[in-house]
């Protein structure tokens, strides 16, 4: 029964991790640089399932090491290498999540495939540094029961403690601290979320607001015109036209934020130009020249204001205000930023669950393994439990 369950787990591990690698390498949506961590982690798990678990199962079922002594040394080194690599990969992924959440703009520009590959190489080098000492220094293998060969990990106390700290306890501590920090950042971001939603968007706060109700009756609401106002024809009213006589849409009013109330068109109630009188001046006759264009006093006599492509011009009684092309785009950037943070937090939560389960599975082994080195005489761990 044990052999059947372990065999099923081996096949399931190989199949599942192969699907992960295939999905990342073939799907365009999964070709982000950080997903290379998942490819390397899946490769380490496949190596554990193919090169470690079958021989470990045979050793447990037979009760002794059936294979050659040389393969025993290589097997133990590979066991430590692949298992340590899996744990350190999870530590690297947690650090990547933390940097992506805490310093998104700065880190995303640095998160290149080359940088991720360098981190993965560092992970494998750390795992190799922990797994190589048993090949160099074998130490005391202990007695051989019934004269049968055994294949056990190094029993030296210094190696047990150092390998346990480097392979499990240090990465586990880093992951706990990192995910605690991510939780605090997410909590603080959620607190600031409602206030950020109600805040005025950057750029729109620079726009002059319509006059409030109750203002002086002689006050005139701002008149919106294009910076390239075209005079009307000598007889009758007309809107600005293009080169072929097609009616052009007012470039200012068409790009105003939706929160602005609709204002009367600049050509309604006006003759031969862009002019308007206040309510007190309705009884008086005021003629506008055919070339009249509203400009500020400071700009009188100066060349007309050039309107860059993609920009907008707001003309009021006090003059013209040139709005850059970035006005109104801050809101979209804010929503994109918030969407990215939400996606990062969701992915971080999933990884936290995976890492939590992984740590719970590894903790009993490393705890009992270290306990035998700390107090070998009084803290005997049963062989079946180990």
Curated annotation (Swiss-Prot):
Annotated positions for site Implicated in ligand binding: 79
Low complexity: bias regions: 289-304
Transmembrane parts of this sequence: 1-25, 37-62, 73-95, 118-140, 157-180, 351-374, 384-386
Assembly: Interacts with RAB26. Interacts with PPP1R9B. Interacts with GGA1, GGA2 and GGA3.
PANTHER family: ADRENERGIC RECEPTOR-RELATED G-PROTEIN COUPLED RECEPTOR (PTHR24248), ALPHA-2B ADRENERGIC RECEPTOR (PTHR24248:SF130)
Function, in words: Alpha-2 adrenergic receptors mediate the catecholamine-induced inhibition of adenylate cyclase through the action of G proteins.
Protein name: Alpha-2B adrenergic receptor
């Amino acid at each position: 029964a044990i052999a059947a369950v372990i065999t099923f787990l081996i096949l399931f591990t190989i199949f599942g991790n192969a699907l992960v690698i295939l999905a990342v390498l073939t799907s365009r949506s999964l070709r982000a640089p950080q997903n290379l961590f998942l490819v390397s982690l899946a490769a380490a798990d496949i190596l554990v399932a193919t090169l470690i678990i079958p021989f470990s199962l045979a050793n447990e079922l037979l009760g002794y090491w059936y294979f050659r002594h040389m393969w025993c040394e290589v097997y133990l080194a590979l066991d430590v290498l692949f298992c340590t690599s899996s744990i350190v990969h999870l530590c690297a992924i947690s650090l990547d999540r933390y940097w992506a959440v805490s310093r998104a703009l700065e880190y995303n520009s640095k998160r290149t495939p080359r940088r991720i590959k360098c981190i993965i190489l560092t992970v494998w080098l750390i795992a190799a540094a922990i797994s190589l000492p048993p090949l160099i220094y074998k130490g005391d293998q202990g007695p051989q029961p019934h004269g049968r060969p055994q294949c056990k990990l190094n029993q030296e106390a210094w190696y047990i403690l150092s390998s346990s700290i480097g392979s499990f306890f240090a990465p586990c501590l880093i992951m706990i601290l990192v995910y605690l920090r991510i939780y605090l950042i997410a909590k603080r971001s959620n607190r600031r979320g409602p206030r950020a939603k109600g805040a005025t968007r950057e750029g729109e706060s620079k726009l002059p607001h319509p006059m409030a109700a109750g203002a002086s009756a002689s006050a005139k609401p701002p008149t919106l015109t294009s910076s390239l106002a075209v005079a009307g024809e000598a007889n009758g009213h007309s809107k600005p036209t293009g080169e072929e006589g097609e009616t052009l849409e007012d470039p200012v009013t068409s790009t105003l934020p939706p929160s602005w109330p609709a204002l009367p068109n600049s050509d309604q109630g006006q003759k031969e130009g862009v002019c308007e009188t206040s309510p007190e001046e309705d009884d008086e006759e005021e003629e506008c020249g055919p070339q009249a264009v509203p400009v500020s006093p400071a700009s009188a006599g100066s060349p007309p204001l050039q309107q860059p492509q993609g920009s907008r011009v707001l003309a009021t009684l006090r003059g013209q205000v040139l709005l850059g092309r970035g006005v109104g785009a801050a809101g979209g950037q804010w929503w994109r930023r918030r969407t990215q943070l939400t996606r990062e937090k969701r992915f971080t939560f999933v990884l936290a669950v995976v890492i939590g389960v992984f740590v719970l599975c590894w903790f009993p082994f490393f705890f009992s393994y270290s306990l035998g080195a700390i107090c070998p005489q009084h803290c005997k761990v049963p062989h079946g439990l180990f």
